[in-house]
């Protein structure tokens, strides 16, 4: 299991490659990225399945403020002999400013015929209906937006096995967004 956190650099490139060589292997890759101002994050992943009956699961989440930008390029490669592969690749992007940008290029290269593989990417803004609902319950807009961002990242944070590290991540994200979301 791998959990990556991208927050501080002006420009950063993150590359991760998993190579599954043993039957029954189970690989998990998670990432959360908070980008602001003119930060750029380039994320590239490859999940290579060379053995049968193996699982890989990738979930990358990005929240983008200001003029920040993210690029996700992911590939699941399944070799001919890697039957019964179960592989997933998901990239989700939350645009918090109209000038923020997210680009995603998920891909599959499958040479085996008995597999369950999927990939997907979504990019969107804060759901206005959800925001309206929270505000109609007396929650100020700024707090409602912050709660939605925290909820967006919680799916990745809950994968962190150390409670102390998970709490530190929550604090880091909370501090990052307390002044940025209006």
Stretches found by the model and what they are:
Residues 25, 144-145:
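Small-residue helix-packing motif on alpha-helices
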Residues 1-132, 136-139, 160, 164-182:
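Conserved beta-strand/loop scaffold segments within soluble protein domains that form the structured core
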Residues 127-130, 146-155:
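Small/polar glycine-rich anion-binding or flexible loop at a beta-alpha turn
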